Structure formats: structure tokens, C-alpha cells
């Protein structure tokens, strides 16, 4: 096969001249020009006039970090023939006998001239900093000091496109670091502090008792400084936000800081650079670039010392607390802080020292906050396969409508470059808001600090604590005008946001029910991302509408928690959850799609069957399953790589400093190479499946696929980029980037992105294959039987004269899929029959099941298994049973377990009633309702009354499929003969015991876990109490009390005993007869319908009481 020519062969290669300056290939030198100038340090003898001067070199090799232990002091390179100065008539210097250790002779023929690579002289201006004005001097005892002034400057590029330099005033003399001290090589940081020598105390001999002094830059006076006096405006008792509000003020903004103007004016240039940014980003850990080091100051330094165990120093004027890390370790440090939930920013130098020299003297190296990373916006590093979402929520009250609250929301996956926006209506239970939070599973939630109700804040705290990792809740100050609908539209249009979206942002928003509140939430998200310097994400991101419930089986947040869909109730982890059971996906995109499908089970019979067809084909053809798995293992995270590639088109990388910009370009080369090779594996998979004609035909019905072969096919298009990668970036995994490579990469990416929509379709198709293959693996590897469900449409009410088809739920051999015992023993299978049979000979079963049984008998497990079977079926997955027939379920409601919410002030019974109220308000005929021990959170009589009334309402008014588990045994007698209720119980048995046991507990209770006809006579709570370890004496007392209460309370239910012989069915007959008799009593003619009614009643009575011979 002839090798495909590179797509770049049609373009003329750019020359070096045309590409010069696009990407700087020079690494940022340690220059350190901003870290602090080179200073002359003068050492004097404590007992003589002789003094020796030596300059501290600022070469790259001599720059040191503050987080490393003291090392051997670097020695100054002096010109050949250098001799220390001696004072006439005085003894030798105190250091004269060891000066040879600090002096290294320069053998180069430089005529005694100092190298000017690291030192740039300045003129005597306000920006000049004399060494003796800044660095403490070692004075002789007679006070004489030899002075040799050297001034220094910093330079950089003359023009910086799209870069706003941090405003600084250059008229304040001082060092070039926020630590208020110049960076200098260390003699255990002796040069950081001025040492005053006395005859009775020499600091070198007693270094543990040094006295730190402050050299006044103006008058040169020395004065002792107490720790913390320089930054009293940072102390907790004095700190204020930008509006001068204290932390106890409800409107206090913890993101900003007020710096007194007089203090800011006295700061040096670099200090102003740092604090002007920090005052607006107090919630961010800010790394400040100084030469070849990144440093943290004050509050951030404390955090670095605490979290990263870095050594903290008290360096600089005012004893500024400081920690630091070298360039090589910054990425690892940032990832550690992100993993612990911190937000991290980096203030970079925009020039190197060489560029600074080129601009001339009297210059300040400009710096800029170029990057802010947060746990919710991370796009690189170890972020895992799960989607990382940042969510913004806005709430408005709709008092005139049935649903009193509307929530607008917007969220983003920065790694995949995808936005979603939508709105939901909710009631006081906040069930819909809980569903949103469970579906999105955000890392961080932005909400209006004053516009969110107390109920919504409770829901935020409740549903964001269900997982094993904490979610950050970030209140956002309300800013009028920036987040209203009109203002947001203006911001999007004026800044060109979402220009790279495959769909217009107007289409995503305008179709929503409450688009204004959704736009407000989107505005909050945009403001936040702009603050984090993520303009590329906003400009190139795709935006889509998001529907929480529409077109799918509704599963609210509480139901997801009760059924343990994503997080277990033990430790909040994934073990023992539905997601974990079905997750056999190989690719990261498949894992994310699986979660999305579980949140949105289908409600369309045709779509469900299309998925089931592919699953059945996989289970029947193991070879296709194996081939698919082999290709999927080769795939990288194509979705995130495509987002990364899209964000690089016309990005802001050109304004980054040379070293950082080169690093970003190197990452882009690697990402582009990976995505091209990854799509090759993906397309090869689809082409291999085309040989399996049946599989590919099923896949085309399920997904939208672009043309793969032919002149316009993706296969030929992709091969051109493969050729370009092989020729121009053969070592793309670790390619050194030149100016020519940068322009080549830009051309390739722009051509590749032209078919971004088609690439997204390929990714979605491959992800669907991965998920459906995962379903097939779950069915194949299951320890119990798995069956393909038979799905019927939702029930449709017809005219009274026509037969009405109601909902059905018929599952035989049902078992809980992930309740397998440790020894591998399966749960006992059971049959669930609710509603009208569609395939049988017209048999009809009641839609409501009243379930009783002993504690620990398996009632809750059966309830959960039933719900999970419905979710399995409507996902398009095989169901853990022998056979399954169901009509579509529109909503699953659950009221399981007993729990209170102490932190939100809600008791167990209030939680029960709130969840039950949501069921009564929203349940329909096609819903599945699961109620477990309703009413146990209050007194016996109140609980029984509520359980009775709720059950009767759902049975007679809603007529939905329902499983109602209870320990109120009189309920079974109340509904014993009700035609729409069937009573069953979880069976148990007893085994005699030889040892002594309390009265009534002399037999062991054996749980059979099998669903059996009829009601259970007791709950056998005393036997369970013995099993739990309650002492025999206590149980015996309880047994006596139970017998007494039964005799007392039994009288109150005597009427129920009598009514069991005159059931609800008889009441219906009597009502019909009375109705007809009233018509006859009023001399009204008896119509044909009345005769039909009488005939039906006669037939029902005859069939009920006449036993066939």
C-alpha cells in the first residue's frame, strides 16, 4: 500500500524568518532579575580596620530555594591577582584566615573586569537600588565601611501582545521580591540579616542567638523589628475585604483584601506586583515566580509549611514568612495542593533576564497571573476517568404556580470543554434539585449567597455529602447587572464566548422553560471562569441544553441515595452500588457515558430494544466482544484530548513567558499525536465491526455515524494527519518544539478541528459500544440467571366503554444483583406479580403489594431488587431474573430506612413525611412506589393512622404499582379482602432450642427469605433482640409486657376483626345497590346501564360464594 502523503505537503513549509518570535525557544533563565539584584556584601573585622568586600554572584548555579537545607556556600569568582584590602596599622581581619574558602580565582583573561552577564548597571535614578541601601553590612569596630555601589536593572521584551502588566511604581527603592528582601546565596542566610559584632558576642560563634535588624533604606538607621508588626492588616483582628468589611459582616467577601493605601504606596515594585494580585485572590494559593523559584508568602507560606512540610523562613524586611520550590518541583506541588482541595494560581515572569537586558536599563520585569487551577476546573494531571464538573445554581420563587421554586443551573467540564445549561421546577422537598446534584456530581457548587433559600441550602449540604469526597460550596456575592439575562447575553456576544461551539448558544438557552434564570446561572459561571483566567474554555467550549427528567425515567436524589446507585450507605464509596456492578467499561469516555445513562434510563420502547439488540449480539458472539475489547484498550481519553486540542486554537499561549509557553506547546504536540493515534484505533475498530454485518447494522440504528470510507470518509482524512505526525513529529511523546514546529502544529490543528462534529460522533459511537459491551459482560459473568426484559408502552386510559390496559410488573425469579454473600451464595429468588398480564390468558393481579415479615427477613432487599430490575430493564440491560415483563415506569419513588438530619433540624418523622408528600403529589398510574415501614418515626397510633391513609390513597386514587412494607399488622386485616391489594410476607421458620430461653423465645428464628402468600402473624422482634445480644432477662421482661399490651390494644382493633368479614368489596356492592335503589325510589326509569350493573353484581356475588361442584 502506497504511503499516504502528509496533508502538509500541500502547504509551503514556513521559513525560520517568518516564524521567528512565534514561540520562544529560550528557557527562562534563573535570572533572577526579579528575584533580587546582585549586591555587594561588606565584611569588616570586629577588631581592626581591615575590611574585605566580595560580591554575591547571581549565576544560575548559585540561586537557591528556601525549601532545601543549607549547602556549602558558593564562592565568588574574583579576577586573577585579586588581593583582599587591608587597613593600615590594624590587625588582620577576623575572617582573613578563612577568606580563601570564599574566594575562587578567575583564570580567564578578563583584565579584572567583572562579568556583566548577571549584573546590569543602572543610572542613578529612582529605580536604582544601591547595594549598601538594601543589604546589611558587616561593619568594622571603628564604624568605617568601604563602599562600592553597584546598581542593577531588569529588562524584557519591548512589546507584549495582549498582556496587561501589573501596575507598579518604580520610585520606591527596595528589593525586587514580595518577601521584602533580595534573593541571595546563603551562608545559612547570614546575608539576609544584618549582624552587629560586639567584643563579648560574635554571631558567627553564637549563631543561635542572632538579633535580626531592619536597615532603613533612607536614613540607614537600624531598628529592632517585632514579628508581625509589618503586616498587622493581615491579622485576624484587623483583616478586611476590599470594601473594608470585617469577617463578621454578612456581606464580607473572603476573596478580597483591603491593603491600607499608605502601606501599599511604600511597597517596592515587586511587592506591589504580588499584593495587587493577592488582594483580589485571597481564596487562591499564589505562587510568585522569582528567578528559577516559585515562592509563597505570609498566609500562603503557612499553608505550604503545613500541607507540604516546607521549611518556612523569616526573610526580608518586616520578617515576611516565606517558603518556596524550584521550577522542577512546581507541577508536583500544585497537584498535591489540588488533590487536597486548594485552588492554586501562578504569577509568572513574562520576560527572561536576557530579554530584560535587551530592553535596556531602568526596567522592571513584568509579571502576570497567567493560570489559576482548581479541583473543579482541572484539565490535566491525575483527574481520573470521572467527569469533573463545576456547577452554578440560581433560584427564583414562583408563588403563583404549583411548583413554587425554579432553579436555573449551568455546569462545565473543563477537561472535555463542554457546557450545559438548564432549569428545573421543584417543590419544598427539593427532590428535583437533589436529582440534579446526584446526576452532575459536582466538585464545586457556586450559589448566590443571598438568593438561595434555606431549603435549597439544606439540599446542597445533604446531596453533596453523599459521596466519599467532599464538595466545595462557594457562595458568590450578588452583583447586580452582571448576571441578569440581558447582561449575560451582552457579555457573551461582546467577548465572543462559545464561538467554537458546534451549536449556537442561543439554541441551547432559548428552548428552556425558564431561560432567564438559566442565563443568570450561566452568568455566574462565566464570571467565575473569567476570574480563573479560563478565557480559552469560554471561547471554544461546546454548550448544550440539559434536561434533568425529560424523556427518561425519573429518579430523584433521595431515590438514588436509597437505592445506592452511585454511593453506598456504609462509607460513601462505589462498592456495592449499581454503577460498580455494571461498570465493565474500558475507556474513560465509556465510563462517563455509563454514569449518564444510569442517571437517565430510557422511556421509549424502541430505543430500549435497540440497546438490547446490541447487548444480545455481544452475548451471542463472544468474538465480537473480544475484538472490541482489544481495540478499546488502545484508546486514550479521546473526549478530553479533543477538548484540549480545540482550546489550543488561537489560544493565549503566545502571551506566556518563553519557558512556560514552550512547555505548553510541547504538551500540545503530545496531545495532538495521541489523539491522531487514538482515532486510528477507534476507526479501525469500527471498520473491523463492519465485517460483522449484523453488529454494524444494529450500531447504525443506535448511533449516528459519519462516513468512514471513501474520498470523503474519515479514514482517508485521518491518514493524512498520521503522515504529518510521522514526518514532522516522529517523537511526539517528547518532542522539542521549535518556531517552525509551532506553526506546523497550528496548521494541523486548525485543519483537524474542521471536522470536530464528526470526531465527536465517532467518540460517542465508541463509547456506546463500550457501555453495551459492559452490559453484556455483566450478563455473561453473572452468578445468577439474567433475562432480556419484555418492555411494553405506558398504560393509556381509554373510554369507559373500552377495556383499559393498566400497568404491569411481572418478574419471576428476581434476585438482588449485588447482595451476593461473601461465600458466593446468591440471594433467594422471588416472584413479583403486579398489574394486568399482557401475555397470559387475561389473568389480573392487584397493583399493590402489602408486605409483612420478621425483622431482618429480607423485605428491604426485595423492595430494592424490584426497583433495580426496573432500572436495568429501561437502561437496555439484562435483568437479574428468569423472566421479566414490564410496562414503562415514568417515576420511581422510594421511602426507605429511618434517618434524621440533625444538622438541618429535621427529625426522622419529618423526613418521612416530606418524602411521602412528594410521592402523593407527583405519583401517577405508571409510577413505581416503594414505601418501607412508613410511620415508624412517631407514636404507634399516629404512625398507623398515617400509614393507613397514605396506603389507601395510593391504592384507590393513584392506582400505581406499589410495594408497601410494614410492621402494622392490623393493616393486613383492613385490606385483607380489597380487590386491588395482595398481602404477602417473607417466610421464616423455627428450630427448637435445648437451652433455657425467655418465655416465647424458646425457638431459634430461621429466615427463609422467600416471598409467601398471606400476612405474617408477627414481626418476631423479641427473637431478633436475642440475636442482637440483648440479655435474656431484659427480653423476658419485654415478652411479658408484649402480652399485656396485646390484650389491651386488641380491644381497640376489635372492630377491624369484625369488618374483615364485611370487606371493602362488600362495601362497593352495597354502594351500587343503594345507588340503584335511590333511582327507583325517585320514580326515575331504570336504564340499561342499571340493569347491567345489577347483573354484574349478581355475577360477582355468585362467583364469590357459590363453590363450583
From Swiss-Prot:
ATP binds at residues 853-860. PROSITE patterns: DNA_MISMATCH_REPAIR_2 (PS00486). Gene3D superfamilies: 1.10.1420.10, DNA repair protein MutS, domain I, MutS, connector domain, P-loop containing nucleotide triphosphate hydrolases. Keywords: ATP-binding, DNA damage, DNA repair, DNA-binding, Nucleotide-binding, Nucleus. It comes from the Eukaryota. InterPro entries: DNA_mismatch_repair_MutS-lik_N, DNA_mismatch_repair_MutS_C, DNA_mismatch_repair_MutS_core, DNA_mismatch_repair_MutS_N, DNA_mismatch_repair_MutS_sf, DNA_mmatch_repair_MutS_con_dom, MutS, MutS_con_dom_sf. One of its GO terms (molecular function) is ATP-dependent DNA damage sensor activity. It is found in: Nucleus. Residues 61-74 have a biased composition (Basic and acidic residues). One of its GO terms (biological process) is mismatch repair. Its main location: nucleus. The keyword DNA damage applies. The keyword DNA damage applies. Pfam families: MutS_I, MutS_II, MutS_III, MutS_V. GO terms for cellular component: nucleus. Residues 19-45, 61-86 are annotated as: Disordered. Belongs to the DNA mismatch repair MutS family. Heterodimer consisting of MSH2-MSH7 (MutS gamma). Component of the post-replicative DNA mismatch repair system (MMR). Forms the heterodimer MutS gamma (MSH2-MSH7 heterodimer) which binds to DNA mismatches thereby initiating DNA repair. MutS gamma recognizes specifically the T/G single base mismatch, but not trinucleotide insertion-deletion loops (IDL). This is DNA mismatch repair protein MSH7. It comes from Arabidopsis thaliana (Mouse-ear cress).
Amino acid at each position: 500500500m502506497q504511503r499516504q502523503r502528509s496533508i502538509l505537503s500541500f502547504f509551503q513549509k514556513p521559513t525560520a524568518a517568518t516564524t521567528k518570535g512565534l514561540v520562544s525557544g529560550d528557557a527562562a533563565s534563573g535570572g533572577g532579575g526579579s528575584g533580587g539584584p546582585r549586591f555587594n556584601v561588606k565584611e569588616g573585622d570586629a577588631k581592626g580596620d581591615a575590611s574585605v568586600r566580595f560580591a554575591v554572584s547571581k549565576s544560575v548555579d548559585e540561586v537557591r530555594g528556601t525549601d532545601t537545607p543549607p549547602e556549602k556556600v558558593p564562592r565568588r569568582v574574583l579576577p586573577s591577582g585579586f588581593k583582599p584590602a587591608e587597613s593600615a596599622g590594624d590587625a588582620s581581619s577576623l575572617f582573613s584566615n578563612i577568606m580563601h574558602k570564599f574566594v575562587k580565582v578567575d583564570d580567564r583573561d578578563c583584565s579584572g573586569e567583572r562579568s556583566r552577564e548577571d549584573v546590569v548597571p543602572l543610572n542613578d535614578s529612582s529605580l536604582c537600588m544601591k547595594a549598601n541601601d538594601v543589604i546589611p553590612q558587616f561593619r568594622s569596630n571603628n564604624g568605617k565601611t568601604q563602599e562600592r555601589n553597584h546598581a542593577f536593572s531588569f529588562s524584557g521584551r519591548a512589546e507584549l501582545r495582549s498582556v496587561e502588566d501589573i501596575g507598579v511604581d518604580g520610585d520606591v527603592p527596595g528589593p525586587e521580591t514580595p518577601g521584602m528582601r533580595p534573593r541571595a546565596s546563603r551562608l545559612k542566610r547570614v546575608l539576609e540579616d544584618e549582624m552587629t559584632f560586639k567584643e563579648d558576642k560574635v554571631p558567627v560563634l553564637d549563631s543561635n542567638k542572632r538579633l535580626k535588624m531592619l536597615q532603613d533604606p533612607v536614613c540607614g538607621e537600624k531598628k529592632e523589628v517585632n514579628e508581625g508588626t509589618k503586616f498587622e492588616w493581615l491579622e485576624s483582628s484587623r483583616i478586611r475585604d476590599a470594601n473594608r468589611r470585617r469577617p463578621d459582616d454578612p456581606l464580607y467577601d473572603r476573596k478580597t483584601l483591603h491593603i491600607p493605601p499608605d502601606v501599599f504606596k511604600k511597597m517596592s515594585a515587586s511587592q506591589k506586583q504580588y499584593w495587587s494580585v493577592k488582594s483580589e485572590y485571597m481564596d487562591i494559593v499564589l505562587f510568585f515566580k522569582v528567578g528559577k523559584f516559585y515562592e509563597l508568602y505570609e498566609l500562603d507560606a503557612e499553608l505550604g509549611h503545613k500541607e507540604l512540610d516546607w521549611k518556612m523562613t523569616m526573610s526580608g524586611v518586616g520578617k515576611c514568612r516565606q517558603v518556596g520550590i524550584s521550577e522542577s518541583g512546581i507541577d508536583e506541588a500544585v497537584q498535591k495542593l489540588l488533590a487536597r482541595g486548594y485552588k492554586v494560581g501562578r504569577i509568572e515572569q513574562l520576560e527572561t533576564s536576557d530579554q530584560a537586558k535587551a530592553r535596556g536599563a531602568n526596567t522592571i520585569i513584568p509579571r502576570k497571573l497567567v493560570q489559576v487551577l482548581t479541583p473543579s476546573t482541572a484539565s490535566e494531571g491525575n483527574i481520573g476517568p470521572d467527569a469533573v464538573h463545576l456547577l452554578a445554581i440560581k433560584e427564583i420563587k414562583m408563588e403563583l404556580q404549583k411548583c413554587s421554586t425554579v432553579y436555573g443551573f449551568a455546569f462545565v467540564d473543563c477537561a472535555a470543554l463542554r457546557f450545559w445549561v438548564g432549569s428545573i421546577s421543584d417543590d419544598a422537598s427539593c427532590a428535583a434539585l437533589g436529582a440534579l446534584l446526584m446526576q452532575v456530581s459536582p466538585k464545586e457548587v457556586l450559589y448566590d449567597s443571598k438568593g438561595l433559600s434555606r431549603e435549597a441550602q439544606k439540599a446542597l449540604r445533604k446531596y453533596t455529602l453523599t459521596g466519599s469526597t467532599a464538595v466545595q460550596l462557594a457562595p458568590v456575592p450578588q452583583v447586580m447587572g452582571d448576571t441578569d439575562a440581558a447582561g449575560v447575553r451582552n457579555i457573551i456576544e461582546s467577548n465572543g464566548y462559545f464561538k467554537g461551539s458546534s451549536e449556537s448558544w442561543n439554541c441551547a438557552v432559548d428552548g428552556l422553560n425558564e431561560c432567564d434564570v438559566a442565563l443568570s446561572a450561566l452568568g455566574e459561571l462565566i464570571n467565575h471562569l473569567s476570574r480563573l483566567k479560563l478565557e480559552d474554555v469560554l471561547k471554544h467550549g461546546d454548550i448544550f441544553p440539559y434536561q434533568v427528567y425529560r424523556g427518561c425515567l425519573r429518579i430523584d436524589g433521595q431515590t438514588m441515595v436509597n437505592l445506592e446507585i452511585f454511593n453506598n450507605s456504609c462509607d460513601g464509596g462505589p462498592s456495592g452500588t449499581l454503577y460498580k456492578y455494571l461498570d465493565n467499561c474500558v475507556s474513560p469516555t465509556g465510563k462517563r457515558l455509563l454514569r449518564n445513562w444510569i442517571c437517565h434510563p430510557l422511556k421509549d420502547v424502541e430505543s430500549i430494544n435497540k440497546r438490547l439488540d446490541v447487548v444480545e449480539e455481544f452475548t451471542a458472539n463472544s468474538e465480537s466482544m473480544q475484538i472490541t475489547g482489544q481495540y478499546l484498550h488502545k484508546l486514550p481519553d479521546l473526549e478530553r484530548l479533543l477538548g484540549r486540542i480545540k482550546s489550543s486554537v488561537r489560544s493565549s499561549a503566545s502571551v506566556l513567558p518563553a519557558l512556560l509557553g514552550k512547555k505548553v506547546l510541547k504538551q500540545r504536540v503530545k496531545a495532538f499525536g495521541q489523539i491522531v493515534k487514538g482515532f486510528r484505533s477507534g476507526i479501525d475498530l469500527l471498520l473491523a465491526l463492519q465485517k460483522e454485518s449484523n453488529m454494524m447494522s444494529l450500531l447504525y440504528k443506535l448511533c449516528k455515524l459519519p462516513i468512514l470510507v471513501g474520498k470523503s470518509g474519515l479514514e482517508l482524512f485521518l491518514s493524512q494527519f498520521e503522515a504529518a505526525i510521522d514526518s514532522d513529529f516522529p517523537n511526539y511523546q517528547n518532542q522539542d518544539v521549535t518556531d517552525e514546529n509551532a506553526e506546523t502544529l497550528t496548521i494541523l490543528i486548525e485543519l483537524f478541528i474542521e471536522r470536530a462534529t464528526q470526531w465527536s460522533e465517532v467518540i460517542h459511537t465508541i463509547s456506546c459500544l463500550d457501555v453495551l459491551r459492559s452490559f453484556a459482560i455483566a450478563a455473561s459473568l453473572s452468578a445468577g440467571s439474567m433475562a432480556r426484559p419484555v418492555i411494553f408502552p405506558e398504560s393509556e386510559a381509554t373510554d369507559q366503554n373500552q377495556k383499559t390496559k393498566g400497568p404491569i410488573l411481572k418478574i419471576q425469579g428476581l434476585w438482588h444483583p449485588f447482595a451476593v454473600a461473601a461465600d458466593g451464595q446468591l440471594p433467594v429468588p422471588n416472584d413479583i406479580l403486579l398489574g394486568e398480564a399482557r401475555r397470559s390468558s387475561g389473568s389480573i393481579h392487584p397493583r399493590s403489594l402489602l408486605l409483612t415479615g420478621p425483622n431482618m427477613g429480607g423485605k428491604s432487599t426485595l423492595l430494592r431488587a424490584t426497583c433495580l430490575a426496573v432500572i436495568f430493564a429501561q437502561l437496555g440491560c439484562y435483568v437479574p431474573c428468569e423472566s421479566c415483563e414490564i410496562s414503562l415506569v415514568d417515576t420511581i419513588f422510594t421511602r426507605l430506612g429511618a434517618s434524621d438530619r440533625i444538622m438541618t433540624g429535621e427529625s426522622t418523622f419529618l423526613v418521612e413525611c416530606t418524602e411521602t408528600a412528594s410521592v402523593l403529589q407527583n405519583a401517577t398510574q405508571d409510577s413505581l412506589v416503594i414505601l418501607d415501614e412508613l410511620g415508624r418515626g412517631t407514636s404507634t397510633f399516629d404512625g398507623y393512622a398515617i400509614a393507613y391513609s397514605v396506603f389507601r390513597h395510593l391504592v384507590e386514587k393513584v392506582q400505581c404499582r406499589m410495594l408497601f412494607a410494614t410492621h402494622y399488622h392490623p393493616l393486613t386485616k383492613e385490606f385483607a379482602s380489597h380487590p386491588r391489594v395482595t398481602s404477602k410476607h417473607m417466610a421464616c421458620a423455627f428450630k427448637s432450642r435445648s437451652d433455657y430461653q425467655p418465655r416465647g423465645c424458646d425457638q431459634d428464628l430461621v429466615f427463609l427469605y422467600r416471598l409467601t402468600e398471606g400476612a405474617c402473624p408477627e414481626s418476631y422482634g423479641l427473637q431478633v433482640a436475642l440475636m442482637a445480644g440483648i440479655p435474656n432477662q431484659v427480653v423476658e421482661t419485654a415478652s411479658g409486657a408484649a402480652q399485656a399490651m396485646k390484650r389491651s390494644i386488641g380491644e381497640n382493633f376489635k372492630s377491624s376483626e369484625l369488618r374483615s368479614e364485611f370487606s371493602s368489596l362488600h362495601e362497593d356492592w352495597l354502594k351500587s345497590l343503594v345507588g340503584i335503589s335511590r333511582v327507583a325510589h325517585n320514580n326515575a326509569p331504570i336504564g340499561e346501564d342499571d340493569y347491567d350493573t345489577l347483573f354484574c353484581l349478581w355475577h360477582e356475588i355468585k362467583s364469590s360464594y357459590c363453590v363450583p361442584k
